[in-house]
């Protein structure tokens, strides 16, 4: 599911898809079920999502992802 109904910000399918992809890729990296679910908690505004950005070497675009989290 791309859209989390708990998120109260702007619904933008492209942003949700981009944020969700980070969690999917992070899950594929570690293969731990809690990574995928925890990464998506609180509309991606959590430390696991930030750690996934680091682990996936997305440091150079972290601000772009964090602004997406603030929108949703």
UniProtKB/Swiss-Prot annotation:
InterPro entries: Crust_neurhormone_CS (IPR018251), Crust_neurohorm (IPR031098), Crust_neurohorm_sf (IPR035957), Hyperglycemic (IPR001166), Hyperglycemic1 (IPR000346)
Disulfide bridge map: 7-43, 23-39, 26-52
GO molecular function: neuropeptide hormone activity
Subcellular location(s) per record: Secreted
A GO CC annotation given for this chain: extracellular region
SUPFAM superfamilies: Crustacean CHH/MIH/GIH neurohormone
A Pfam family recorded for this sequence: Crust_neurohorm
Modification sites for Valine amide: 72
Keyword Disulfide bond: yes
Residue list for modification Pyrrolidone carboxylic acid: 1
Modification type D-phenylalanine: residues: 3
Tissue: Produced by the medulla terminalis X-organ in the eyestalks and transported to the sinus gland where they are stored and released.
GO BP term, pick one: circadian rhythm
Keywords of the record: Amidation, Carbohydrate metabolism, D-amino acid, Disulfide bond, Glucose metabolism, Hormone, Neuropeptide, Pyrrolidone carboxylic acid, Secreted
Family of this protein: Belongs to the arthropod CHH/MIH/GIH/VIH hormone family.
Chain's role: Hormone found in the sinus gland of isopods and decapods which controls the blood sugar level. Has a secretagogue action over the amylase released from the midgut gland. May act as a stress hormone and may be involved in the control of molting and reproduction.
PANTHER family, alphabetized: ION TRANSPORT PEPTIDE, ISOFORM C
Protein name, UniProt field: Crustacean hyperglycemic hormone
């Amino acid at each position: 599911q791309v859209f989390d109904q708990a998120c109260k910000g702007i619904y933008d399918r492209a942003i949700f898809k981009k944020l969700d992809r980070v969690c999917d890729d992070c899950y594929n990296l570690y293969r731990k079920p809690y990574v995928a679910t925890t990464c998506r908690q609180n509309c991606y505004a959590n430390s696991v999502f930030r750690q996934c950005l680091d682990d996936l070497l997305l440091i150079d675009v972290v601000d772009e992802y964090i602004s997406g989290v603030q929108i949703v």
